[in-house]
From Swiss-Prot:
PANTHER family: CELL DIVISION PROTEIN DIVIB, CELL DIVISION PROTEIN FTSQ. The gene is divIB. It is found in: Cell membrane. Residues 60-259 are extracellular. The keyword Cell division applies. It comes from Exiguobacterium sibiricum (strain DSM 17290 / CCUG 55495 / CIP 109462 / JCM 13490 / 255-15). Residues 1-38 are cytoplasmic. Residues 60-129 form the POTRA domain. This is Cell division protein DivIB. The keyword Cell membrane applies. Belongs to the FtsQ/DivIB family. DivIB subfamily. Cell division protein that may be involved in stabilizing or promoting the assembly of the division complex. InterPro entries: Cell_div_FtsQ/DivIB_C, DivIB, FtsQ_DivIB, POTRA, POTRA_FtsQ_type. GO terms for cellular component: cell division site; plasma membrane.
Length: 259
């Protein structure tokens, strides 16, 4: 009978010592991994706190909102239309396209551009509609713009090519404005003054032209008839000026004597 071989104790001791040697290394690696996770969590928490702080602070909101280019339209109307409130509106909620669309819907504004500078400073530059007429009597001075907008305003020296409107109430001025915007600029520039002539003809108008002629016509026929004015005067006797009445037909009566 064979004798039982003794266990190889030295080899087992070496294995145990090897595992004991590796345990500190494994522990160190686990500790480093846990530290990295903790750092990532702390960074994430810090970022979240920073975002919350930023959103709650004034740094995330519109710092200034300036409007340039206004002449007749009030800046307050433009700012209100933009829906931007300084120190209240968050900058990331500001859509340039939407803001400009709302501003260009303001009566009297033809177009607008917007630029943004550092730290949420905004500036909007507007181009107003051209002034095409000026009403100088009661209930107060008013300016008529090319889009038909009627706004309070004082006489301006630069209105050289715009007619003066006299004797119009708010209602009659609105009716005239709807027709006035349909007049070609080259014809409109020939009108010196338009007077409400309601005393003789309801809705009637008396126009004093820059060439010396006077035109009588109704508001309803204003735009259609007056756009033919150049053709009408070309058919008049050369060198003659007078009163042109447009009422179904066209009638010319020269002034008596020299005007």
């Amino acid at each position: 009978m064979k004798e039982q071989q003794p266990a190889r104790q030295p080899k087992m001791d070496a294995t145990v010592r090897s595992l004991e040697d590796k345990i500190p290394y494994v522990r160190e690696q686990r500790r480093k991994k846990a530290n990295r996770r903790l750092i990532y969590v702390l960074i994430l928490i810090g970022l979240l706190i920073g975002v919350v702080f930023y959103l709650q602070s004034s740094f995330s909101r519109v710092a200034t909102f300036d409007v340039t280019g206004t002449v007749n339209v009030k800046k307050e109307d433009i700012i209100q239309a933009s829906r931007i409130k300084v120190k209240e509106t968050h900058a990331f909620n500001v859509s340039e396209e939407a803001v400009l669309e709302r501003i260009e819907d303001v009566p009297g504004i033809r177009e607008a551009t917007m630029k943004k500078t550092f730290l949420h400073h905004y500036e909007v530059d507007v181009v107003e509609e051209k002034e095409i007429a000026y009403a100088k009597d009661k209930p107060g001075a008013r300016i008529v713009l090319a889009d038909g907008t009627i706004i309070p305003g004082k006489s301006k020296e630069e209105l050289f090519d715009a007619p003066i409107l006299t004797g119009f109430t708010d209602q009659s001025l609105e009716r005239l404005t709807k027709e006035l915007v349909k007049i070609e600029p080259k014809v409109r520039s020939r009108i010196s003054e338009i007077v409400a002539n309601d005393q003789t003809d309801k809705g009637g108008l008396k126009l004093f032209m820059t060439d010396g002629n006077t035109v009588l016509l109704s508001t309803s026929a204003f735009s259609n008839s007056l756009n033919e004015y150049v053709k009408v005067i070309s058919a008049l006797p050369k060198g003659k000026t007078g009163t042109i009445t447009i009422d179904g037909g066209i009638y010319f009566k020269p002034y008596k004597g020299k005007k």
